[in-house]
Amino acid sequence: MDSARAPTEDEIAKFLATRTSSQMLQLMRCIKQPAAQFAFTAKLLTITPVKNTPPTVPEKAKKALNAFVGFRCYYIAIPAFKPWPMKKLSNLISLLWEGDPNKSLWSLMAKAWSNIRDQVGKDQAPLDEFFGIICPHLELPDPAYYLDLHGWSLGVNQEGDPTLLRIIDSKPASIGIGHINLALSVEDIITFVQKAGFAPTYTPDANDTSPTFLGQSLSSTFEVNHPANSIPAASQVDQARVAARNRRRAKRQSARELEFQEKLENDLEFKEKINREMDLVLERTPPAGPDPLPDFDFTPFYEGVNNLICEHMAMEQSNAGYPEGAHLFNDFGIDSSKAYLGMDNFATDMPDLIDYDAFRLGANEDVALPVFDDIAHA
């Protein structure tokens, strides 16, 4: 029997490089001689580590482009939509899609672009360039004329948001008239765009035949071009949906307008009520200014007090010319028991009040004495 073959250096290096850390520690413990341990350690330092290649994960298949997404990417360029942000146009694009009669064509175009993208990548297959080539070929309406051709009118509601209204007596455009009686497949679309220079590196799979195609018979052509059947049945259903939606929106808008009008009327009525109450308050409030003087009734007593005060003030003013220390007749501080004529410096401010002729010697005793006003009030 042949003896065991000694492993080569490459085999030893591969063996050591594929060991785990715990296995390497066990090998180190098995070597007892110091020289052998040194040689083993030096060998470990020179070994090139083996790179573990992770298992290849199959690339996840990309999601195919949705027909509505393709429609939105193409017709978002409608010139009337430029002033508005995308969040305000989302509902409008959905409304256009519901009434669009070319949904089958958009499904074919979306599938064709998805096949090209999956092979060459999204960077090598720009979606806007793809639509710019194939849409005019299929005679789809240009974004600049789409609203007019399909009977749509863009307006603004009371909230300032854009809104679409269907024009009465308008007939939506059908699919491309030049291709209405031809069978159209995904491969036909890919072949056309490649001839136009789009995605030249794409290689179609000869064994893959797409079951997706679009075809119209001559009878369908007659039905579309006949005046009595100018609108397809599907388009009529879409129009009925749009009309129902517009009626619901108009009803909600009318309710909002009625509510706003009622609120405005209530506010005006409340304002008028406040104004009337303020007018009543102003009428009842006396005018601003000094307090009026009290209206006292006339009585003889108050009239006599008033005359006495006024006469006393007049006497004080008229007595200002007499000498200082003179005893005046109207001085209430003099002694009543002492005769006026016996006073020194006696003076009176009533020279014309007393008739002294009645008191001279030999005077007529029947002479009339002066009359004093205060006797009548005694």
From Swiss-Prot:
Give the annotated DNA-binding region, as residue ranges.
60-117
Q: Which Pfam families match?
A: MATalpha_HMGbox
Entry protein name: Mating-type protein MAT-1
Q: Where is this region: Disordered?
A: 235-256
Entry function: Mating type proteins are sequence specific DNA-binding proteins that act as master switches in fungal differentiation by controlling gene expression in a cell type-specific fashion. Transcriptional activator that induces the transcription of alpha-specific genes.
Q: Which family does it belong to?
A: Belongs to the MATALPHA1 family.
Q: Name one GO cellular component term.
A: nucleus
**Coding gene?**
MAT1
The signal peptide, as residue positions, is none
Q: Which GO terms describe its molecular function?
A: DNA binding, bending
